[in-house]
Every structure is written in structure tokens, then in C-alpha cells.
Amino acid sequence: MSVRVARVAWVRGLGASYRRGASSFPVPPPGAQGVAELLRDATGAEEEAPWAATERRMPGQCSVLLFPGQGSQVVGMGRGLLNYPRVRELYAAARRVLGYDLLELSLHGPQETLDRTVHCQPAIFVASLAAVEKLHHLQPSVIENCVAAAGFSVGEFAALVFAGAMEFAEGLYAVKIRAEAMQEASEAVPSGMLSVLGQPQSKFNFACLEAREHCKSLGIENPVCEVSNYLFPDCRVISGHQEALRFLQKNSSKFHFRRTRMLPVSGAFHTRLMEPAVEPLTQALKAVDIKKPLVSVYSNVHAHRYRHPGHIHKLLAQQLVSPVKWEQTMHAIYERKKGRGFPQTFEVGPGRQLGAILKSCNMQAWKSYSAVDVLQTLEHVDLDPQEPPR
């Protein structure tokens, strides 16, 4: 992906939206220097193979952006971003799309309100793209030299906006519908998600089968218990009916699980219990003008790059009921010949969970990882990758 393509991706996906006027974004103040102005001449670029840029530049000159998902939200996120160009305009646009003050909720909470699926997904989406604005302001070469992006669950929408596949307001609208539909589906069935740290001999699929049989013995029809996230070797998230997850916790030693922990989410995301949410999201995506990404974006569903707009339409809806193949995505992005260096990796958005996962998937790639702080007001990119995930 050439530098010019990466530039036009960002201007098309976000910066260009500022020039559309009141329909989506306020017109920027006179003299404001933002992504749109900087990249105004970045048009007409020819597309190349996704990693062609790395053939012409040292790997360390290239960058990869990772966008976090639900669970990374924390009261105060966005505080460290408000002094950067365009960020307040992003939150103003979000208020019009959502119908409530997302910035106020992100900054002041309360946490239990922010944690609701209907609120945290839009909050993470906007904070992540605001973090990109901060990164662009401090290190514009990172945006110019980006060769790939990936997002965890709802983070995939932010990655696609960054890559120019959809406009900010349209992407946020899709996230809003997605979050509302997932919240409603979650409330229909007592369900949840269980983080499981296993061992090489752990029997994840057998454990899920046993848990489903246990639920059937209790009279639960069509019980759900399945792997919903592949995080890193021997670590999975299993989702399903609450009774199934309690069974797994009680019998963790039988399945060689080292540690289990219930996640603070409202339902069994990325399982068939989310099927009621598929149609609302599918209809919402029909209203979104999706374009081919100009920076390679990897799908959660199969850990391969998106190829065309129809691909995106289909897989974003399918993602709701499919496991997130994040471990496989990390291998797809960072696998390379022995002796070849790694790109810089930036986690853009709240938390450092994706950095911790990258460390467990690929230690060498993690050595070039940084997190863009969304909490502090200090004007720097936080380069400490060792803080544990929240």
C-alpha cells in the first residue's frame, strides 16, 4: 500500500467528511490544519499489493493500527484527546448521530452507564478515531506509512472508517444500531462470556459440549456454549447460557483450565444467541456507502483482508454470530520470513488489551508496540507496552 494510498484513505474515511458541511460534520474553523487539508493533494493514487510498501521501505518504517473492542471502556477516556485538532468536532458529530452527549458520558460516567453495550460501543468507536487524530498530530508519518489495520469486534468498524471504507457518521450510525440490537438480544436470554486461560492439553470443545449437555439436563432447550474469541495460544473466551458458564467454572480442573473469569458484558456475543441482532445491522449497513478499503483491514470472521464492499457488508453482519479470530489475525499480519523486521504497531483507543495479546502471540512484533493514551492530557504517545490490560 503506497504512502499516497494510505493518505487518501484517511482523508476519505474521516477528513473528507468535514468538507461535506452540516449533513455530517461542522465546517472546520478557518485556518485549522487537519488531516483533510494536509492530504488534499493525495488523490488518484494507484493501489498496490498490501505489503508492497514494505518491499520499498524498511519494516520499521511501516505501521499497523489496532483498534480495541468492548471491555476497554473506562470513565475519563477522551480526556487526553480534546486538545488535538478535530476531536471536539468528532464528539459534536457523534452527539447528533446518537442523540445524547457521548463526550460527557465518556469523561464523567457513571461507569455502570458507560458499560452498557448501547453506550460503550459508540464510545470506544469515537475514542479510537479521536486517538488516530492525536497520533496523526504527533507522528503524521505513522498514518502516512500505515500498511494494515485490524479491530476487535466493534473496533473493526473504526478500522474500516480509518481505512476509508465508510464515513465517520455512517460508521457510527451502524455501530449505534449494532449496539442497540446486541443489547436487546442480550436481555432476551441470561447469557455471558467467560475468559479461559488454558494449557496445551485443555479441551475447549469438549468442555463446551459437556456444558451444553449439562444445560439440557436442566431443561434448557437448544443451549449455547461455544468459543467466541480466539485471543492467543491456549486462551479463549467461551460464551453462552449462564448455566453453561457456571458449569465450566465449577469443573475447570476437569478440562485443564488454569484460570477462568466472567467478563463484564451483557450477553453471549459472537454466538448464535446474537442472531436477532443480525437483521437490524444488515439493514443499517444497506444505508452505508461502503467502499473498498485503501489500507488492508483484516476481518474478525476469517482473519483475511477484506476484498471489496460486498465482502464488508456480508462479514460485518456475520461477525455478530461468529467467533473473533484475533489470534489468527495476529499471525496473518505479523507472519514473515526469518530475519525480517516488524512494523511499528499502535493501539489506538482505550486500554492496552490488544498489546498484551500481541505480546502473547508474537513477542518480536510486540517489541515495536505502543499505545496511544486517551486518558492523560500529556502531549506524547505512551511508549510503555508493559502495563497489563484492564
UniProtKB/Swiss-Prot annotation:
Catalytic activity as recorded in UniProt: holo-[ACP] + malonyl-CoA = malonyl-[ACP] + CoA
Associated pathway: Lipid metabolism; fatty acid biosynthesis
Keyword NADP: no
Cellular component aspect of the GO annotation: mitochondrial matrix; mitochondrion
Broad EC category: transferase
Keyword Transit peptide found: yes
Residue ranges of coiled coil: none
Transit peptide as recorded in UniProt: 1-21
InterPro entries: Ac_transferase_dom_sf, Acyl_transferase_dom, Acyl_Trfase/lysoPLipase, Malonyl_transacylase_ACP-bd, Mitochondrial_malonyltrans
Annotated compartments: Mitochondrion
GO biological process terms, semicolon-separated: fatty acid beta-oxidation; fatty acid biosynthetic process; mitochondrial small ribosomal subunit assembly
Gene3D superfamilies: Malonyl-CoA ACP transacylase, ACP-binding, Malonyl-Coenzyme A Acyl Carrier Protein, domain 2
One Gene Ontology MF term: RNA binding
Keywords assigned by UniProt, alphabetized: Disease variant, Fatty acid biosynthesis, Fatty acid metabolism, Lipid biosynthesis, Lipid metabolism, Mitochondrion, Transferase, Transit peptide
Signal peptide: none
Disease field: Optic atrophy 15: A disease characterized by visual impairment in association with optic atrophy. Atrophy of the optic disk indicates a deficiency in the number of nerve fibers which arise in the retina and converge to form the optic disk, optic nerve, optic chiasm and optic tracts. OPA15 is an autosomal recessive form.
Summary of the function given for this chain in its UniProt record: Catalyzes the transfer of a malonyl moiety from malonyl-CoA to the free thiol group of the phosphopantetheine arm of the mitochondrial ACP protein (NDUFAB1). This suggests the existence of the biosynthesis of fatty acids in mitochondria. Also acts as a mitochondrial small ribosomal subunit (mt-SSU) assembly factor.
UniProt similarity note: Belongs to the type II malonyltransferase family.
Protein name (database record): Malonyl-CoA-acyl carrier protein transacylase, mitochondrial
Lineage: Eukaryota, Metazoa, Chordata, Craniata, Vertebrata
